Amino acid sequence: MPINIDYFSDDKYQYSTALMFAYINLCKPNKTKLNVDDLKFNLDYNCWANNVRPIDVLNDMKNKKYKDELTRIKNANIKYPIILDSNYKILDGYHRYVKHIIENKKTINVYIFDKKLMKKFIIGKRHEINTLEINDFIELFNRRFKKILLKYE
């Protein structure tokens, strides 16, 4: 039975955020500190349910239709870095990013994944229905990160 695992998609592929988190937890990549303003272009993406953009929420925070997103922003734990691709597109962490803006933070900790690393997180083409099960994700991670895993044996 397929499981519901979050993913990010671009115009070609779906990328597993679960694999990204596993990579972060195991490999402890370096964090980078960026200016919050460097990521503002991300506010215009339809990244949330019902085609809601972060900029819509920021511009109309009293609107009841944004209640769920505002709750998620309020509850977001900003101690965790957000995840970016090499173009600074947010892959995971929109709510944490918006919380930084609301709290007038000037900098944000991020992980930046280059194109080579991003290939390891691909789980399918953009418009394919994902039928992967938990064991499939474990197998993918083991296969794609075998060299790293060998260091821990």
Describe the predicted segments one by one:
Residues M1-I55:
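Glycine-rich short-loop/terminal segments
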Residues N87, F113-K115:
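Beta-hairpin (beta-strand-turn-beta-strand) motif
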Residues N87-E103:
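A sequence-level detector for short glycine-anchored, His/Arg-bearing signature motifs
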Residues I83, V98-H100, N109:
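Short, hydrophobic/aromatic-rich beta-strand segments within well-structured domains
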Residues D37-K89:
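Short alpha-helix boundary/capping and kink motifs at helix termini
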Residues K115-E153:
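Amphipathic, charge-rich alpha-helical segments that serve as recognition/docking helices
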Residues K106-F113:
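Short hydrophobic/aromatic-enriched beta-strand-loop microsegments
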Residues A76, N104-K105:
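Short loop/turn hinge sites at secondary-structure boundaries
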